[in-house]
Amino acid sequence: AGEGLSSPFWSLAAPQRF
């Protein structure tokens, strides 16, 4: 959740994880 702010790409990489 918080990491999404630092790594916006993570949201596209694993949206199911968050």
Swiss-Prot record:
Modified residues (Phenylalanine amide): 18
GO cellular component assignments: extracellular region
Official protein name in the record: Morphine-modulating neuropeptide A
Keywords: Amidation, Neuropeptide, Secreted
Main location: secreted
Originating organism: Bos taurus
Cysteines engaged in disulfide bonds, as pairs: none
Function: Modulates the action of morphine.
Origin superkingdom: Eukaryota
Subcellular location: Secreted
An individual GO BP term: neuropeptide signaling pathway
